Every structure is written in C-alpha cells, then in structure tokens.
C-alpha cells in the first residue's frame, strides 16, 4: 500500500508542462485526494474483503452441514425411539387384552418418558443450531470490524507525514482564530 501511495505522490513532482501530475496542496485538492484514496481503498480492499467473506461463508456452510449431520443422528435416534414406542404399544395392547393393569401403567410411563425424551432431543437440536448460527455471525462481525480498523489505521499511517500533519493543525488553528474573531 505504501508503494502505491508513493507512486501517486511522485506524480506530483513531475513538471506540469504537458504532462499529468497531482497537486499535493491538501487545502486546494482535498476532494480529489480523498476520491483517489477512496478509489484505491475500494479497488484493493474489495478483493481482500470478498476473499474473507468467501472463506467465512465456507466455514459457516461447513458448520451448518455438521449441525445438519447431528440433526440426522438425532432423527435416527428419534426413529429408534418411535420403533421402540410402537413395540411397547403392541406389547401393551396384548397385555391389556389379558387384563394386566400394571402393564398399562408401564406403557403409559414409557410413552410419556419417550415423548419427553423426543421433545428434549428436538429442543437440544434447535438450541444447538441457533447457538452455532449466533456464534458464527458474531465471529464474522468481529473479524470484519477488526480488519477494517487495521486497514484504516494502516492507510492513515502511510498517508500522514509530519509536514501534512503540521499544515492541517495550522489550518485548523487559523479557522478557530477566524471563528473567534467573528464571535467577538
């Protein structure tokens, strides 16, 4: 990034007789300089940002796929539990015909227990998916803001030198003096 900035600054030292050059007077060309800096940031930053987002998207998709695989495992357990429930129901009906009320109670308890287990499995699956999505969204946001801040600091450090800094301070002091004279 510093080489790109240096190449633009070196254009300002060319003679203006029949050639292209940049005016480095910050007060006279502030919109032009800002548009050039923004153009360079957008040009070089969009590739990095799109790569970052693509990588993050792949990670998110992989995590979602893993969560779906866990969900498939939960569905398999659910099917086993349903099969067991059907078996217990069949056995309970046979014992009911024979008049065993204790078996009826066990059937009811097993059905209730299985139903509670199935409901808990479904709730756990949904909670896991929701938690993973929130965690991934938070990580993407944190990484995006961190990289944006690092790029902005790097750009400012590479573009700001002592002379420019002193001229900006002097101009701001002059504006404050003018404002004070107007208010007095």
From Swiss-Prot:
The record, for Pfam families, names: ATP-synt_B
Recorded topology in the membrane: Single-pass membrane protein
Q: Name one GO molecular function term.
A: proton-transporting ATP synthase activity, rotational mechanism
Keywords of the record, alphabetical order, are: ATP synthesis, CF(0), Chloroplast, Hydrogen ion transport, Ion transport, Membrane, Plastid, Thylakoid, Transmembrane, Transmembrane helix, Transport
Q: Which cellular component appears as one GO term in the record? A: proton-transporting ATP synthase complex
Query: Does Ion transport show up as a keyword for this record?
Result: yes
Q: Where in the cell is it found?
A: Plastid, Chloroplast thylakoid membrane
Q: Which domain of life is it from?
A: Eukaryota
InterPro entries, from UniProt?
ATP_synth_b/b'su_bac/chlpt
Q: Transmembrane stretches, by residue range?
A: 27-49
Q: What else is known?
A: In plastids the F-type ATPase is also known as CF(1)CF(0).
Self-association and partners: F-type ATPases have 2 components, F(1) - the catalytic core - and F(0) - the membrane proton channel. F(1) has five subunits: alpha(3), beta(3), gamma(1), delta(1), epsilon(1). F(0) has four main subunits: a(1), b(1), b'(1) and c(10-14). The alpha and beta chains form an alternating ring which encloses part of the gamma chain. F(1) is attached to F(0) by a central stalk formed by the gamma and epsilon chains, while a peripheral stalk is formed by the delta, b and b' chains.
What family does the Swiss-Prot or TrEMBL record give for this protein? Belongs to the ATPase B chain family.
Q: What does this protein do?
A: F(1)F(0) ATP synthase produces ATP from ADP in the presence of a proton or sodium gradient. F-type ATPases consist of two structural domains, F(1) containing the extramembraneous catalytic core and F(0) containing the membrane proton channel, linked together by a central stalk and a peripheral stalk. During catalysis, ATP synthesis in the catalytic domain of F(1) is coupled via a rotary mechanism of the central stalk subunits to proton translocation.
Q: What is this protein called?
A: ATP synthase subunit b, chloroplastic
Q: Which organism is it from?
A: Cuscuta exaltata (Tall dodder)
Q: Which gene encodes it?
A: atpF
């Amino acid at each position: 990034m510093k080489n790109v900035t240096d190449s633009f600054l070196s254009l300002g030292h060319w003679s203006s007789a029949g050639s292209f050059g940049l005016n480095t007077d910050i007060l006279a060309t502030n919109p032009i300089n800002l548009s050039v800096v923004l153009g360079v940031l957008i040009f070089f930053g969009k590739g990095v940002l799109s790569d970052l987002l693509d990588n993050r998207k792949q990670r998110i998709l992989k995590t979602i796929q893993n969560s779906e695989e866990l969900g498939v495992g939960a569905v398999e357990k659910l099917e086993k539990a349903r099969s067991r429930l059907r078996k217990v129901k069949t056995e309970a009906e046979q014992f009911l015909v024979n008049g065993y009320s204790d078996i009826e109670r066990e059937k009811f308890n097993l059905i209730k227990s299985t139903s509670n287990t199935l409901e808990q499995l479904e709730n756990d699956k949904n909670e896991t998916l929701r938690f993973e999505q929130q965690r991934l969204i938070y990580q993407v946001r944190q990484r995006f803001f961190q990289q944006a801040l690092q790029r902005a600091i790097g750009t400012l450090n590479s573009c700001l030198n002592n002379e420019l800094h002193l001229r900006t301070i002097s101009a701001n002091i002059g504006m404050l003096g003018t404002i004070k004279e107007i208010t007095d």
